[in-house]
Every structure is written in structure tokens, then in C-alpha cells.
Regions:
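N-terminal catalytic or cofactor-binding beta/alpha core of small enzyme domains
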Residues: 13-262, 272-278, 370, 378-383
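N-terminal Sec-pathway targeting helices
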Residues: 1-15
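Active-site-adjacent mobile loop/cap segments within catalytic or ligand-binding domains
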Residues: 331-384
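Envelope-exposed proteins and targeting segments
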Residues: 173-176, 225, 262-264, 290-294, ...
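Structural recognition of the beta-strand scaffold that forms the well-ordered cores
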Residues: 178-181, 229-231, 264-267, 295-298, ...
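Active-site-adjacent substrate-binding region
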Residues: 309-336
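Solvent-exposed loop/turn segments at secondary-structure junctions
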Residues: 184-187, 235-239, 270-275, 301-304, ...
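A short, glycine/acidic-enriched catalytic loop
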Residues: 197-201, 273-308
Length: 384
């Protein structure tokens, strides 16, 4: 993979040197202006790294424009900085100021307690046993309305802190919701005959089967509801899982700079739930057995990093969960609060949502994503 990236970089530089004269003559002025404007809107290092990685999307830059950009004085003046950024990307060194513990916690997943593990396991069509997790005993939870919150952080939390409306609001113009996937290669358990090519355990680069597909479904529901969405379809956890939150943070910062109208950021993942023996379980909504259960994971300042407004994100999560509870009381699992920030310090409308588990099927996750997106849209359009 590293050889492929390096080859792409050398090839693009060589082509730019050979074709500079032709590009300068034939490249449309508007195309060049738009490309340079994108340089202004997005940090140069991030933009070029996205290009070299090949994850900018089909409409990122045309070939002629890319070649022209490689030869601009702006790029030549910043060659040293770009080289340093490229080296850092390959080495995947974590930023000491960032929230690296999130990667490790997400990889660990959830282990069912003995009480949550059924005595008799019924295997479903994709080979995974099924459970529906719900809280019935308020002991150990912070309870706010119909929402149960498991505070696994060192930050103080009381139900009285969650009263009032959440802070984030829809704007009048421009993109309003950013959907991103810090761990985009996470995937599900497919039925026999529908398997995908794996890149790691329960992970794939096939965007029709991983979290990118789930984000596509959410984006479509939100768009149909009249909400403007930016969906980042990049994979930040491949080829290295470590450092994914650093890389997605750089993109979130870039999007918020480019689109200041964005008030809500959804980082869409899937969970991994297993018993003490390592058996993967699927989690299903009790009211719709064709839909997986979802869970909000809310970051805090419990780990010592600055995140004073984290409870605003939690208030939003509670509002969305109350909306969904009316029709699907068990669609959402209890909310989990952790010490890590998960990049949620960037807005007061940032949520990490786990759609299903590694044991769920893609179809169950898609159905859950669409139900969730409809409830999320209804909540933020009502504003309370």
C-alpha cells in the first residue's frame, strides 16, 4: 500500500513537469480558479494528502487541475511542509494533544455480562445469535425522562444538568449536517453467499458493505427531509487503525472552516458485542426485528482534555433518543459517556452513533440507520 501511495506521488509530480506547458494552455480558467479556491478553503496538507491517498472522491479534482496545482508556486513553496505531513501520515504517529484512547476503546467493543447472555442461543440466518439490550433497573444509571445514561467517565453528571434545550440549531442556508466515519472500514456479518472481501476482522474496504454505506443511507433520509448534508466517505482507519481520530479531526476542522453553517456532526460507527467466550452477538430492536439496535457514545472532559460543553452533546442525544422512543422504545440502547472526547469538542451538536454490532447483518444495520436518521431529522427540525 505504501509503495502504491509513493508511486502515485512520484507519478503525479513527473506528469506535472512534463505536461505543465500543455495544462497552462488548455486548462479552463474556471477549473483552475475553483481548484485554487479549494486550496484556500482546505488546509493544503490535508487536501494534498487526501489527493495522494486517492480518497477525495470522484469530484475532488480533475486530472488536468491536479497537474496544474502540482506546478503552482504555492505548492513549490510548501514542499517541505507537505513532505513532513506525508511522512507523518505514513508513520501514523499520534498527536499527544489528541484523544487517542478512543481508538483502543472502540476496538475493544462491549462484553455481555452473564445476566445479558441467554441460556439458550438461537442462531439467526447470518450465523449470529441475537439479543435486545434494554435497561429496566435504574440502579447504576443516570435517568433523564425515558433515557438511561451509563456514565463511564470521571466527569460529573446529574439529570438536573440536562434540563433545557440543546444548544445546536439548524441554520438557514448551507450544509447543516456533516456525516463522517472515523472507523469507516467497520462492517457486519453477511449471510452465506453475500460475503465481502475483508481487510481485517469484521472490516472491509467495500463501501457498499461498510460504514460508508450506512452513512449513505442516513444522508439520503436527511436529504429527503430537506436537510443539507455533507457526507465524508473517506476511510480514516485504513491502512492503520491507530491515529484514526487524529485524521478525522483534521477533516472535521476543514469542513467546519469551509462550511460554517454546519451545526451537527455525526460520526457513524458500529459496535462489537460478544460474550465472555468471544461469541459475537447481533442486537435487534424489539419493535422491529429487522433493525439493529443503536447506541450513542458521548465524549466528555473526564480524561483531562478541554471539552467544557460536552453536556450539550449529551442533551442533543437525549432529545433524539426521546423522539425515537415514542415509536421504537428499544431501538436505542442506553447512552454511554466516556472520558475520551471523540472529536465532539468541535461543535455542540456532535454525536458518535454505533449502528448495530459486528454480529448484525448489513440489512439490519441499514434499516436501523434509516429509522435513526428519520428520528434525528424530526428532532433537529423541531429544535427541542
Amino acid at each position: 500500500m505504501q509503495k502504491k501511495r509513493t508511486g502515485r506521488m512520484l507519478c503525479s509530480l513527473a506528469l506535472s513537469a512534463v505536461t505543465l506547458w500543455g495544462v497552462s494552455v488548455t486548462a479552463p480558467a474556471k477549473d483552475a480558479r475553483d481548484a485554487l479556491r479549494s486550496l484556500k478553503d482546505e488546509t493544503l496538507g490535508v487536501m494534498l494528502l487526501r489527493y495522494e491517498r486517492g480518497d477525495g472522491g470522484e469530484d475532488f479534482l480533475s486530472l488536468r487541475t491536479s497537474l496544474a496545482l502540482h506546478a503552482t508556486p504555492l505548492l513549490r513553496e510548501g514542499e517541505e511542509n507537505i513532505a513532513q505531513a506525508w511522512s507523518a501520515e505514513l508513520e501514523q504517529k499520534p498527536d499527544d494533544s489528541a484523544d487517542e484512547t478512543g481508538d483502543a476503546q472502540d476496538r475493544e467493543g462491549t462484553v455481555l455480562t452473564q445476566e445479558e447472555t441467554p441460556d439458550e442461543i438461537a442462531v439467526t440466518e447470518n450465523g449470529s445469535p441475537a439479543r435486545t439490550l434494554k435497561a429496566s433497573d435504574p440502579s447504576g444509571y443516570t435517568v433523564f425522562g425515558n433515557v438511561y445514561i451509563n456514565n463511564g467517565s470521571d466527569a460529573a453528571l446529574d439529570a438536573s444538568m440536562l434540563s433545557g434545550d440543546y444548544a445546536a440549531k439548524l441554520g438557514a442556508e448551507g450544509p447543516q449536517v456533516l456525516i463522517i466515519h472515523t472507523h469507516g472500514s467497520e462492517s457486519y456479518t453477511m449471510p452465506p453467499g453475500q460475503e465481502y472481501d475483508v481487510s481485517d476482522t469484521f472490516r472491509t474496504l467495500d463501501t457498499n458493505c461498510n460504514m460508508i454505506r450506512i452513512g449513505d443511507e442516513m444522508a439520503q433520509v436527511l436529504t429527503d427531509a430537506g436537510i443539507s448534508v455533507v457526507h465524508d466517505r473517506s476511510l480514516y482507519d485504513y491502512p492503520s487503525y491507530s491515529g484514526a481520530y487524529n485524521r478525522s479531526l483534521a477533516s472535521i476542522e476543514s469542513y467546519l472552516q469551509k462550511y460554517p453553517s454546519i451545526s451537527f456532526v455525526l460520526d457513524v460507527h458500529r459496535d462489537a458485542v460478544q460474550d465472555a467466550n468471544g461469541q459475537q452477538f447481533k442486537l435487534l430492536c424489539g419493535e422491529d426485528k429487522n433493525a439493529a439496535q443503536l447506541e450513542f457514545v458521548i465524549g466528555s472532559n473526564g480524561g483531562g482534555l478541554s471539552h467544557d460543553l460536552w453536556r450539550e452533546n449529551l442533551k442533543l442525544a437525549c432529545a433524539v433518543q426521546e423522539t425515537l422512543y415514542k415509536d421504537y422504545p428499544t431501538l436505542m440502547r442506553p447512552i454511554t459517556v466516556r472520558n475520551s472526547r471523540y472529536n465532539q469538542h468541535m461543535t455542540t451538536g456532535s454525536l458518535l452513533v454505533e449502528v448495530g454490532t459486528a454480529g448484525n447483518s448489513l440489512e439490519e444495520a441499514v434499516n436501523a440507520a434509516r429509522l435513526f436518521a428519520a428520528g434525528f431529522a424530526k428532532t433537529i427540525q423541531n429544535g427541542t
